């Protein structure tokens, strides 16, 4: 098992049971999935750049990324149905814990002037969203092989009922939140 999965079972789960006075062990908040997504934006027309972005996300996640296509045509955005609009990868189980461990212990400490993740990324249902401005903080990414730098959105879905439980869960995992508000 992964380091964070062991940490969850040995120390985080009992701490959450104690703090939130949970009687049923199946109701303890846990990680459900992590979704990494990138909007293609202006690069959607260039197939080479789009494939390079997908390969980069696949390297970071350790799982093949999927190019997502538009479901409907939107004239205002100059998008046609079936047009590539982004890239995503969904991580569950062991790969999810491995990615979170890499994010917390390697990638985020390499961000220049990092002050912590914003606390306002919770959606009210126990899920947390945040964005990273570039992909170069991950050790798998080689600067020479990148055609364009791009950011990414990371969504951490939990089984928590509310933001307070989700915040405590992610804080116990070691996600560095910004001090203050």
Curated annotation (Swiss-Prot):
SUPFAM superfamilies xrefs: RL5-like
Annotated Pfam families: Ribosomal_L5 (PF00281), Ribosomal_L5_C (PF00673)
Cellular component, GO annotation: ribonucleoprotein complex; ribosome
Single GO MF descriptor: tRNA binding
GO biological process, one term: translation
UniProt keyword annotations, A-Z: Ribonucleoprotein, Ribosomal protein, RNA-binding, rRNA-binding, tRNA-binding
Assembly and interaction partners: Part of the 50S ribosomal subunit; part of the 5S rRNA/L5/L18/L25 subcomplex. Contacts the 5S rRNA and the P site tRNA. Forms a bridge to the 30S subunit in the 70S ribosome.
Biological role stated in the UniProt entry: This is one of the proteins that bind and probably mediate the attachment of the 5S RNA into the large ribosomal subunit, where it forms part of the central protuberance. In the 70S ribosome it contacts protein S13 of the 30S subunit (bridge B1b), connecting the 2 subunits; this bridge is implicated in subunit movement. Contacts the P site tRNA; the 5S rRNA and some of its associated proteins might help stabilize positioning of ribosome-bound tRNAs.
Entry's family note: Belongs to the universal ribosomal protein uL5 family.
HAMAP family: Ribosomal_uL5_B
Record protein name field: Large ribosomal subunit protein uL5
Source organism per UniProt: Campylobacter curvus (strain 525.92)
């Amino acid at each position: 098992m992964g380091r964070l999965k062991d940490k969850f079972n040995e120390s985080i789960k009992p701490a959450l049971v104690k703090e939130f006075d949970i009687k049923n062990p199946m109701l303890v908040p846990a990680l459900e999935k992590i979704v990494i997504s990138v909007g293609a934006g202006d690069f959607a027309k260039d197939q080479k750049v789009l494939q390079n972005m997908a390969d980069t996300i696949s390297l970071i996640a350790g799982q093949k990324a999927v190019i997502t296509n538009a479901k409907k045509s939107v004239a205002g955005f100059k998008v046609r149905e079936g047009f590539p609009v982004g890239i995503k990868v969904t991580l569950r189980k062991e790969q999810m814990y491995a990615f979170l461990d890499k994010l917390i212990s390697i990638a985020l400490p390499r961000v220049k002037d990092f002050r912590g993740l914003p606390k306002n990324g919770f959606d009210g249902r126990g899920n947390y969203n945040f964005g990273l401005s570039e992909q170069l903080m991950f050790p798998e990414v080689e600067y020479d092989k990148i055609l364009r730098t791009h950011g990414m959105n990371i969504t951490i879905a939990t089984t928590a009922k509310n933001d307070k439980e989700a915040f405590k869960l992610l804080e116990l995992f070691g996600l560095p939140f910004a001090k203050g508000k």
